[in-house]
């Protein structure tokens, strides 16, 4: 490796800057163009100013999206309609009857 002139600034050293300028292309070659391109394009890290995302205004026809919810039929219950408490009592009474036999 050739010795570098000590009076030269680091950013002016030979090979410190690419021969072509950076562009907005995201292809594999352009992602490896320089360290800045690699950070921005390859890794998606940018320390620049963030752009504001514009919020879309609500259309005039909609009133705050306050549409009524359509009524749905109640779900039908399956199994024993009397509930689990009475079924436990029935099981207990059957168990007592079996013990007596």
From Swiss-Prot:
Site feature Essential for Tat translocation through the endosomal membrane, where: 11
Free-text function comment from the UniProt entry: Transcriptional activator that increases RNA Pol II processivity, thereby increasing the level of full-length viral transcripts. Recognizes a hairpin structure at the 5'-LTR of the nascent viral mRNAs referred to as the transactivation responsive RNA element (TAR) and recruits the cyclin T1-CDK9 complex (P-TEFb complex) that will in turn hyperphosphorylate the RNA polymerase II to allow efficient elongation. The CDK9 component of P-TEFb and other Tat-activated kinases hyperphosphorylate the C-terminus of RNA Pol II that becomes stabilized and much more processive. Extracellular circulating Tat can be endocytosed by surrounding uninfected cells via the binding to several surface receptors such as CD26, CXCR4, heparan sulfate proteoglycans (HSPG) or LDLR. Neurons are rarely infected, but they internalize Tat via their LDLR. Through its interaction with nuclear HATs, Tat is potentially able to control the acetylation-dependent cellular gene expression. Modulates the expression of many cellular genes involved in cell survival, proliferation or in coding for cytokines or cytokine receptors. Tat plays a role in T-cell and neurons apoptosis.
Organism domain of life: Viruses
Family: Belongs to the lentiviruses Tat family.
Region span, Transactivation: 1-48
Positions that bind Zn(2+) 2: 25, 27, 30
Phylogenetic placement of the source organism: Viruses, Riboviria, Pararnavirae, Artverviricota, Revtraviricetes
Protein name (database record): Protein Tat
A family per Pfam: Tat
Compositionally biased intervals (Basic and acidic residues): 85-101
Chain positions with N6-acetyllysine modification: 28, 50-51
Protein localization: Host nucleus, Host nucleolus; Host cytoplasm; Secreted
């Amino acid at each position: 490796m050739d010795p570098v002139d000590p009076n030269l600034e680091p950013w002016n050293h030979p090979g410190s800057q690419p021969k072509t300028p950076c562009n907005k292309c995201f292809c594999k070659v352009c992602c490896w163009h320089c360290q800045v391109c690699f950070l921005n394009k390859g890794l998606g890290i940018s320390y620049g100013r963030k752009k504001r995302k514009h919020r879309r205004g609500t259309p005039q026809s909609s009133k705050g999206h306050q549409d009524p919810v359509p009524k749905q039929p109640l779900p039908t219950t399956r199994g024993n309609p009397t509930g689990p408490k009475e079924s436990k009592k029935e099981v207990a009474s059957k168990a007592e009857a079996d013990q007596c036999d």
